[in-house]
Amino acid sequence: MGIIVYKPTSPGRRNASVLNYKEIITKTEPEKSLVFTEKKWAGRNNQGRITVRHRGGGHKKKIRIVDFKRDKDGIPAKVEAIEYDPNRTAFLALLCYADGERRYIIAPEGLKVGDTVMSGPDADIKVGNALPLKNIPVGTMIHNIELMPGKGGQLCRSAGSVAQLMAKEGKYALIKLPSGELRYVSQECRATIGQVGNLDHENVRIGKAGRKRWMGIRPTVRGSAMNPVDHPHGGGEGKAPIGHPGPLTPWGKPTLGYKTRKKNKPSDKFIVKRRK
């Protein structure tokens, strides 16, 4: 998939590029039965307090119902369309099953309109097919990996993501994640064959602040530019040092390199090698 690089006709266009969607998108309107609308929360919780900063505004979006479980076993499905989804970096493939049901899945690299995919233990080792890890050969590239059997895929779902099945030992399979982490997952967990599509996503240059605003992302103000009442880094004359042994969050907690993972987490025993 190609990238369109704009000519510098204005300051905002000078460093901007976009994906050439015409090369891959085959349908512009989503399947009506598989979308719903949701109120914008702008980073607020049910009490109206900001729990995630720098969120708000942005273009209206419809939520697509995506099948991460791939639990419709033994029934072949034909790819009807490849669609854009504003809620994720990957594209979606619209499947039409032999019994007439339609579902969205994350579109893997190489999946085209007219291809047939299937899920279940008896499915072939083919791009887009979903199987339990116990039925996938060692060395296979996989995505949309479950952490608990039947819960639905949670790992490797964004554009270009791919993991590798490294080994099988007893009830568990060893997988290598894009972060470099090696971890065990139950062999009953399902994964989809192949790599998530839209590999060029990482090469797109946003180019201007306005494009981030369209995405619903607001500006991030540096703590050193604030007053002392607003941030531990604030205050001082001119560009003053932060005045602490290390950088702090707006709430006074250590940050930038500070480990935030819970100690003695139950899943620690499944992680062979931590992420880089």
UniProtKB/Swiss-Prot annotation:
Subunit structure: Part of the 50S ribosomal subunit. Forms a bridge to the 30S subunit in the 70S ribosome.
Protein name: Large ribosomal subunit protein uL2
UniProt cross-references to NCBIfam families, sorted A to Z: rplB_bact
Domain of life (superkingdom): Bacteria
Zinc recorded as keyword: no
Region (Disordered): 223-276
Basic and acidic residues composition-biased segments: 265-276
GO cellular component labels: large ribosomal subunit
GO biological process, one term: cytoplasmic translation
A Pfam family annotated for this UniProt entry: Ribosomal_L2_C
Similarity comment: Belongs to the universal ribosomal protein uL2 family.
InterPro entries: NA-bd_OB-fold, Rib_uL2_dom2, Ribosomal_uL2, Ribosomal_uL2_bac/org-type, Ribosomal_uL2_C, Ribosomal_uL2_CS, Ribosomal_uL2_dom3, Ribosomal_uL2_RNA-bd_dom
Any GO molecular function: structural constituent of ribosome
Keywords attached to this entry: Ribonucleoprotein, Ribosomal protein, RNA-binding, rRNA-binding
PANTHER family, alphabetized: LARGE RIBOSOMAL SUBUNIT PROTEIN UL2M, RIBOSOMAL PROTEIN L2
Family matches, as PROSITE patterns: RIBOSOMAL_L2 (PS00467)
Function comment: One of the primary rRNA binding proteins. Required for association of the 30S and 50S subunits to form the 70S ribosome, for tRNA binding and peptide bond formation. It has been suggested to have peptidyltransferase activity; this is somewhat controversial. Makes several contacts with the 16S rRNA in the 70S ribosome.
